Amino acid sequence: MSHNTFGHLFRVTTFGESHGVAIGCVVDGCPPQLALTVEEIQRDLDRRRPGQSRFTTQRQEADQVKILSGVMETASGQVTTGAPIALLIENTDQRSKDYSEIKDKFRPGHADFTYEAKYGLRDYRGGGRSSARETATRVAAGAIARKIVPGVTVRGALVQMGPHRIDREKWDWNEIARNPFFCPDKDKAAFFESYLDGIRKSGSSIGAVIEVVAEGVPAGLGAPIYAKLDGDLAAALMSINAVKGVEIGAGFGAAELSGEDNADEMRSSSSNMGNNGPVFLSNHAGGILGGISTGQPVVARFAVKPTSSILSPRKTVDRNGADTDIFTKGRHDPCVGIRAVPVGEAMVACVLADHFLRHRGQVGPR
Amino acid sequence: MSHNTFGHLFRVTTFGESHGVAIGCVVDGCPPQLALTVEEIQRDLDRRRPGQSRFTTQRQEADQVKILSGVMETASGQVTTGAPIALLIENTDQRSKDYSEIKDKFRPGHADFTYEAKYGLRDYRGGGRSSARETATRVAAGAIARKIVPGVTVRGALVQMGPHRIDREKWDWNEIARNPFFCPDKDKAAFFESYLDGIRKSGSSIGAVIEVVAEGVPAGLGAPIYAKLDGDLAAALMSINAVKGVEIGAGFGAAELSGEDNADEMRSSSSNMGNNGPVFLSNHAGGILGGISTGQPVVARFAVKPTSSILSPRKTVDRNGADTDIFTKGRHDPCVGIRAVPVGEAMVACVLADHFLRHRGQVGPR
Amino acid sequence: MSHNTFGHLFRVTTFGESHGVAIGCVVDGCPPQLALTVEEIQRDLDRRRPGQSRFTTQRQEADQVKILSGVMETASGQVTTGAPIALLIENTDQRSKDYSEIKDKFRPGHADFTYEAKYGLRDYRGGGRSSARETATRVAAGAIARKIVPGVTVRGALVQMGPHRIDREKWDWNEIARNPFFCPDKDKAAFFESYLDGIRKSGSSIGAVIEVVAEGVPAGLGAPIYAKLDGDLAAALMSINAVKGVEIGAGFGAAELSGEDNADEMRSSSSNMGNNGPVFLSNHAGGILGGISTGQPVVARFAVKPTSSILSPRKTVDRNGADTDIFTKGRHDPCVGIRAVPVGEAMVACVLADHFLRHRGQVGPR
Amino acid sequence: MSHNTFGHLFRVTTFGESHGVAIGCVVDGCPPQLALTVEEIQRDLDRRRPGQSRFTTQRQEADQVKILSGVMETASGQVTTGAPIALLIENTDQRSKDYSEIKDKFRPGHADFTYEAKYGLRDYRGGGRSSARETATRVAAGAIARKIVPGVTVRGALVQMGPHRIDREKWDWNEIARNPFFCPDKDKAAFFESYLDGIRKSGSSIGAVIEVVAEGVPAGLGAPIYAKLDGDLAAALMSINAVKGVEIGAGFGAAELSGEDNADEMRSSSSNMGNNGPVFLSNHAGGILGGISTGQPVVARFAVKPTSSILSPRKTVDRNGADTDIFTKGRHDPCVGIRAVPVGEAMVACVLADHFLRHRGQVGPR
């Protein structure tokens, strides 16, 4: 069971609410003797941190992470021991505010009604457990996960905002760090600046599509049928707040293709195949066939809906079932998809780490 | 861990290869005292059975299921006992054939290379474990799952074939059983007949999109963060052979929407809210918010790639890494998406059954 | 969750009732390319098979096992493929009999009342799912498990029957196969023959203690805290029907020892320590410290209660709660502990296989 | 998988090392709307806390627990929300000391060698993760677990120290809190005082047996075959540091009994059977038959070996494989079994809570 845990051999359990004392996670199953410093984790957290531009929530959180367990100093620096690694991030900006507006009303598009329907009560302070704040702990866990599969690089990019898609011909990974959108298309990033400003100023919000690419994934990761690599990626990405769709490789586009166009042909690699497998002449598969990695880049995309916290009044009901209107005040992200980029990377890194360990266990060294 | 098992309280473990002795599954965790006959399971299996029209593989399989355990006769008929229910389907048409073409060559778009990369060998007879034949056992398990959540109806439909989408205004569930495509749009079904005939005769294949709708799902099913109802649906649907994308409700379309357009507003229901929750004025959420069901219909779609078994020669490599061409002979489905409809229904039914039991355990009767 | 499944990377799911059509299991997670024949599995099953002496139930079951999936013929013989291995044993001797005596009465010491309390009904035919017949499938799975840890030998012995313990000085593994009790002490075996004959003729029954020894277990198997090797062994052995106690190494005897007497001292091995670790000067630990194997033999013991199916009338209640007496007719084992020996071996083999794979995944090759 | 997690619907994940910054746990799956205060958890922790008498380690730890998440204030006090409850205990007395003696030598009877064999390194400071300090977090989790099964009381007692067993005729639960041994036999407690003083002063240690009794367990908890209530109890109790044996009810004594003596006869209860089931005339079963609770008290015992930290020099090897002697200085428990009493209670409470939720999910309200 895994309500607040994901993974099998590499397992992450998260805890904490938006406006509680602290959030954190326990990373269990990390192999021993991996070099790990708090700075490496902080670096990833800083990429997700709110309040870094006018395009994300103005909540100010330092998101300073502490390692509580699972590492020790050795002659060659701080390393993992094989024991569970607990990470803690204290909440500092839970802004004391008036909750009367949302305490008894269900915000449309949020999990207010469903948490109440499930549990009979809900933590209304900042969304409680359903807040995207929880994703900070995923990014922290992902920083550890990145170290597990030798040679893997996991990078994400915003490839669509509203109806506007990037020009794939202009894809430049170096651009990602140069704009506040993690956008790999320089021109589109410039456009998004004014586009999103308009949305922000009008108090509205907009959806986005994120693409995560993992390069250097060895062939053979994944497992048959119900532990497919793409099945686990789908669950992991769909578990991110506000995600409504996931696709691998050609994705929904594959529905429009013929077998000739879709199936990726192969040619022998110049080097020996044993190491690298064949050269694929295309990658509609997104690096996964039959649930198992092909050795090509793993490519996953996910759709993030617009945040439902907007500044215009909305029809809803209160806890007593009476009709009312609700008016969301306070800080919000005009495009929550932006900060989902490092979260998506983290989830992909965690899934790959887990499958790397599982594959090593199940099939082992030859 | 769950290589060949899915679910938690309602758990299904499947086994068997395309051309082996038999396929089957073990359904564990089914509550006791549910009426269950072999005919009910057979009825669902017959909907998926190959060879029923010229648009699916001509393999002839009776797909006769046997119940090996977990039920007993009582005064009120045959019921489940709470013990694991084992189901067995013998393979009858494993057509003795010449495997020399595919034994040492990797079919593009199939799991041939990846199984070999993972395991160092593969069962090349009809695809072995990676064959869609395994999905018959899912349909059998799904027939049991359908009985668990009181009042739930799970139905699927083919909503797109190649670039051709159905007209949603013409959606009629009664049409599903009247054409060989599970298509709810009568006119489009007529079109698909000639369209797919052309593809079939040319030895090509085409992708499709399937939509599954579950009505009568009570509010409150699902669980936070890593056991979200949509996360589990995404994993379950992505685990179906050839699926490359999954979306819930507005799905990828949500990326193009503003917060005003996307968030589903609420109004009080005329009856008491306790039972049914509010009336939602739209269903972009696809019946799920924060990973938990809203009480609206749960709507999931998945994209099925075109089968890679086509009649034109394709570039590939052999097991020794040498370049070669491969030419797939034999039976195939011109649109594997068609038979994925009952499989998709079964997966959704299984996920709902599992979450119903988990919710009952976790939150329980008030 | 694991009602009818055990293990994580090496997972066994069993099904079937005593008097149903068939019993069987699905072994998932077995590494590929292991040589495996049906004869190897049958050999282990034959050691557990009933009706082989007058000291076990006279039920006649051929216990012929079939492999339904997960293996294929290769140039070097039949091997595992990495796919789930389904094993099936048809029930042949479910003797048509009159169940009226036990249908509505709860047999003391059996699971009759508890199954009814849990499920609201029970399969009264031969004990249904709670029958020891299920253990045949464990022995079959164990035969596969034995092949996974290189160099491991798992052997069991009956070391106590009623109050009579074997003389450990006379322990000879070769004796195990020479008497119907799996007893390693030749003299005690001769005594047991007349002792158990007396019990059998009087229609009574007696308890026993079984010891399982696994030699060749590499140091390092097991995992911290809640996945300790001894924790998993305890659960696995306690899951065998009629087992009421489990101990490792000195076991309950350790409660009477001082720290000086109990802790196993170490000396360097003549060979290099890297391979074999230190030489331990005693083995009170039973080969496990901190939940992790030391490299010494793993020693586990379990207590089996006397069967509650005896020929004297017993006080009980019926399904309506009325007082009554019950008189068990029919076949029974005067000492069910005897046939628990191969079952205990199988469970230990399965736990070791699982931990071997988990260790390889978690820590991997250096 | 569950290296540092136990339970399924009620799940506990623990973290932290003996001499690290903090220890803690995440309790996931706790039902919502349970009243829970930090004082209730602290009360249980205080019973286990070291340094309360001269018979336990003199390490001074306040063991002040903080609740980081999963609760909220309501009109009727602080309650659980259904979100994961994170508990944190800061380490305060990690006494800066000289580790040179144990850093490179393996202490006999400890997990030093095995952790090193598994992970290639170990946290030698106070035993790191293998220290009994981890059990404080179990007691904290157990305090929550106690609230889940309505009407259940879980109490433990020390029933044997070295070869000295209590007189069961003198059992008085009220005595438990009146002596530093959790001993229910007043006279034996007085004896233990001088007995253990002798052992303590000589720098030696001694083993013990603990009995845990759960009253008010409803009939029907547990699950077939591999999720038996006794199987889970065995794993849970064996996972406590230094435990070498577990038994239920008559336990190993059952091996010496005949079927007539062992099987618990039944008589109708004066009240209606529906609620309470039959009256059992004895409880050799320890409240569990076929892995499912009978409604009688659940009785489990476990054997705790003497601590291996003693003041006389012991033969061992160092990390280089060279022979050496080791001399354990510092604080230790002369009988670690004493503090295992509240830990055993906590584990039993957790297993019962988990099975209560699972039963409710699986079988549900009728």
Swiss-Prot record, chains A, B, C, D:
One Gene Ontology term of the molecular function aspect: FMN binding
The keyword Amino-acid biosynthesis is annotated on this UniProt entry: yes
Any one GO biological process: chorismate biosynthetic process
Keyword Flavoprotein: yes
Annotated pathway: Metabolic intermediate biosynthesis; chorismate biosynthesis; chorismate from D-erythrose 4-phosphate and phosphoenolpyruvate: step 7/7
One of the record's GO cellular component terms: cytosol
Cofactor: FMNH2
Enzyme class: lyase
Co-factor binding comment: Reduced FMN (FMNH(2)).
Reaction(s) catalysed (UniProt annotation): 5-O-(1-carboxyvinyl)-3-phosphoshikimate = chorismate + phosphate
EC annotation from Swiss-Prot or TrEMBL: 4.2.3.5
SUPFAM superfamilies listed in its UniProt record: Chorismate synthase, AroC
Sorted UniProt keywords: Amino-acid biosynthesis, Aromatic amino acid biosynthesis, FAD, Flavoprotein, FMN, Lyase, NADP
Domain of life: Bacteria
Signal peptide: none
UniProt-listed Gene3D superfamilies: Chorismate synthase AroC (3.60.150.10)
Positions bound to FMN: R129, S130, S131, N241, A242, G290, K305, P306, T307, S308, S309, R331
Binding positions for NADP(+) per the UniProt entry: R48, R54
Oligomeric form and interacting partners: Homotetramer.
General function of this protein: This reaction introduces a second double bond into the aromatic ring system.
Family: Belongs to the chorismate synthase family.
PANTHER family: CHORISMATE SYNTHASE
Descriptive protein name: Chorismate synthase
